[in-house]
Amino acid sequence: MKRNGGTIGVFPLVVEMVVSGFLFLFILVLNLVMGALGYLMEKDDYDPDADLQKINKNPRKFQLGIMLALVEHGSVIALTIMLFIAFSPYNIILGIVWIIFRTGEGLIQYINEPNYWRLIEIARQYSLVSGAGKNSWSDLARSIFKTKDTRFKFAMICWSIGTLAFSIVLVTSDVVPQIIGWLGIVASVLVGFGTGIKLVKPRFKFEVVGALFGMLFEVIIGGWLLFYSII
């Protein structure tokens, strides 16, 4: 392979690509496990009373979900750095765009977690009171859920911009099959469009299509970088 007319060191490039591929797939697996533990990146319907009861029933499970979320956010930032090292020489400007926005994505989600962790204590307090006394704790939980959802939407806009920049590099550099890059472009546009509209119309469901395309893109690019790079 060549990078800006020069020969790329084979071993460093393979290492960068393999680690990037692993992180793509690792992040997807973490999201699945987090969902199974009750940690949701985004909620469409708010039922804080039911959520607080569920959290208080098994707080350790909820804690584990948050800890895995912290690992996921850190992995997003690590992936961004590895992709920048491996691919930015093909287009440094687009490389700077994706490292800014995808690092921003990870940092925005980190900001959520201290408040989300508070739900464990809120759930405990909620269980100790009855009647109207529950309302204040329920309202506080609802506020935390809404704040998290809003921040998540901004994180997804960062994902969209960063992934669009990365995908354009994939299409123009011929490092991977162009179809993968085009899939990333489609996914990033759909996610950005759907998320932007949902900020205005919360009941808008089109972002699900973008999410499916985004997952498909990350599975394919992750698998290609992890396995094809070492063949």
Where are these regions (language model features)?
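Hydrophobic, aromatic-enriched alpha-helical segments typical of multi-pass transmembrane helices
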Residues: K2-I231
